[in-house]
């Protein structure tokens, strides 16, 4: 559809300043004028009371470069900014707890994002192929699982330090991060699945500050289960005691 309308007396949805909002959950679903929204470059007029950005709310807004997220927002929905190719930076409110599946997938111009301290969930492929994204500050979050393909192809990542809450890194979570060099893990209950860092050709150093992981997949780096791709051997694999 090119336009969305809400009938008078609707008990669930309202239109507020050109935006469609579920008034029961304070979820923003998108713009009334869908076609016009796809061509906007800057958005600073979202309702200031919304708590959630809904699924696909801004997906394929290929000209969007900048958006202000209201301070009370706590979750970014599935594919909400999928393929916003020109979006360069986004400031997430400090209270954000959840970033949905594919939320920023293929935002190829995205350079910076700050998770804040309350994020505990990042969905599968949330930042898939964000090839210009600088390494976010994972360390201060409450993330427990890095889901598959979450950061596939994030080529600007170099050193990543994970929070003590992390207990699992899933298959392909950081695959194709070609410049990733160092990983620092701060958990004593860690499982790294097969292929979690496949094709990370420059990965050289792993640090486990709380001792050895519970499990490391046999093909963590490469399909042969022996060495990282390109035969770039890991030069350090130790805990804080050097063991």
List where the protein language model places each region:
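Structural signature of tandem-repeat unit edges
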Residues: 1-19, 23-52, 62-75, 85-98, ...
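Consensus positions within tandem repeat domains that build extended binding/scaffold surfaces
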Residues: 30, 54-57, 77-80, 100-105, ...
